[in-house]
Swiss-Prot record:
GO biological process, one term: photosynthesis
Main location: membrane
Keyword field contains Electron transport: yes
Subcellular location: Cellular thylakoid membrane
Species this protein is from: Synechococcus sp. (strain WH8020)
Subunit text: Heterodimer of an alpha and a beta chain.
Described purpose of this protein according to its UniProt entry: Light-harvesting photosynthetic bile pigment-protein from the phycobiliprotein complex.
UniProt-recorded name of the protein: C-phycoerythrin class 1 subunit alpha
Covalent S-S links between cysteines: none
Top-level taxon: Bacteria
One cellular component (GO) term of this entry: phycobilisome
Topology relative to the membrane: Peripheral membrane protein
A Pfam family that the UniProt record links to this protein: Phycobilisome
Residues that bind (2R,3E)-phycoerythrobilin 2: 139
Amino acid sequence: MKSVVTTVVTAADAAGRFLSQNDLEAVQGNIQRAAARLEAAEKLAAGLDKVTREAGDACFNKYSYLKQPGEAGDSQVKVDKCYRDLGHYLRLINYCLVVGGTGPLDEWGIAGAREVYRSLSLPTGPYVEALTYTRDRACAPRDMSPQALNEFKSYLDYVINALS
């Protein structure tokens, strides 16, 4: 994956020129976004267990029928697997924040996820609800800076849209 820095420098070199003010502003913007992503990744990692638990609890509160016999969360083992899956998605979002792209989610979280859930008769709606709760609950400056929160929410939206 080419970075903005590599792209800008390569274009300037190909044109045989120094970096322009616009080039430098693009690089600076990229560095600022990277700093925001790293802040979001750090905050998410520090609170992963709490975020996962709150998201899962919100999901099971909204979809309480899931704990009824024959449903996706009818045993503690199945409930624990739901929390595990939520933690997995949040961990992949953490990786995306660090690398600055959706590659980890695309490769390890989304590709085939809907088909797997469908084949196991697991609804994706509760996962969407849990991740939506996380997105809507997060707030700046309580949780992280506004720019970091924007980066975090963009990856939450990406997963929500993929599972919807």
